[in-house]
Curated annotation (Swiss-Prot):
GO terms for molecular function: DNA binding; serine-type endopeptidase activity. This is LexA repressor. The active site is at 158 (for autocatalytic cleavage activity), 196 (for autocatalytic cleavage activity). It is an enzyme of class 3 (hydrolase). The lineage of its organism: Bacteria, Pseudomonadati, Pseudomonadota, Alphaproteobacteria, Hyphomicrobiales.
């Protein structure tokens, strides 16, 4: 389990390593996370190291190695990661897309689509389903692809190890079915909505969190209705 700041720092270090070949300085980390002092960065680095996400190399300045990322295998850049959602994130303050994988062609490059925001979704204990359209957000058409889409504001931290944070806007493609491993909007007993990973277990359905602090829910199919699949995230800083 990672906190929001731990996740943001891990991602920042990994991106800098890929771009420049060296990790950022502590001052750069402090500025990137908008912290007042480097002591906060030291605590975050220690927490990431204790959880096995990074390794500090001895006797070398600014020597940090990323060992793994949430929902990926041991090598973040390799092909041995286990199957799962790696979110495409639109960063609201920068106005650019950071795709985890290509989600569409180039025909719609530059075009945006108004996506209705339908309320909140629990990434934690299921909350009552909300059906009220409050407003819209503009999304790149080539990120959304085909089909109908809507957005839900994430509440809770049960999917944090999949890179889905409290306060994110989840971009959902409408769908009434799912494959094992998909992250879905699941409506339970026609009254509670939750964002979880979908798996079939024999004749039952498992709704799995991506946070060890939460339990997997095993339910009969007649109690679960799929309302869409997660395809991306919109995040403001």
């Amino acid at each position: 389990m990672l906190t929001r700041k731990q996740y943001e720092l891990l991602r920042f270090i990994n991106e800098r390593l890929k771009e420049a070949g060296v990790p950022p300085s502590f001052d750069e980390m402090k500025d990137a996370l908008d912290l007042r002092s480097k002591s906060g960065i030291h605590r975050l680095i220690t927490a990431l190291e204790e959880r096995g996400f990074i390794r500090r190399l001895p006797n070398r300045a600014r020597a940090i190695e990323v060992i793994k990322l949430p929902e990926l295998g041991v090598n973040p850049g390799g092909g041995n990661g286990r199957r799962g959602f790696t979110p495409s994130v639109i960063e609201g303050n920068l106005g650019r897309v950071r795709p985890a994988a290509s989600l569409g062609g180039d025909d719609d490059s530059g075009r945006t689509v108004a996506v209705p925001v339908m309320g909140r979704i629990a990434a934690g204990t299921p909350i009552e389903a909300l059906q009220t359209r409050s407003h819209t957000i503009s999304m790149p058409a080539d990120m959304l692809g085909s089909g109908e889409h809507y957005a839900l504001e994430v509440r809770g931290d049960s999917m944090v190890d999949a890179g889905i944070l409290d306060g994110d806007m989840a971009l959902i493609q409408k769908n009434d079915s799912a494959d094992t491993g998909d992250i879905v909007v699941a409506l339970i007993d026609e009254e509670e909505a939750t964002l979880k990973r979908f798996r079939r277990r024999g004749a039952s359905i498992a709704l799995e969190p991506a946070n060890a602090a939460y339990e997997v829910r095993i339910l009969p199919p007649n109690r679960v209705r799929i309302q869409g699949k997660l395809i991306g995230l919109y995040r403001k800083y």
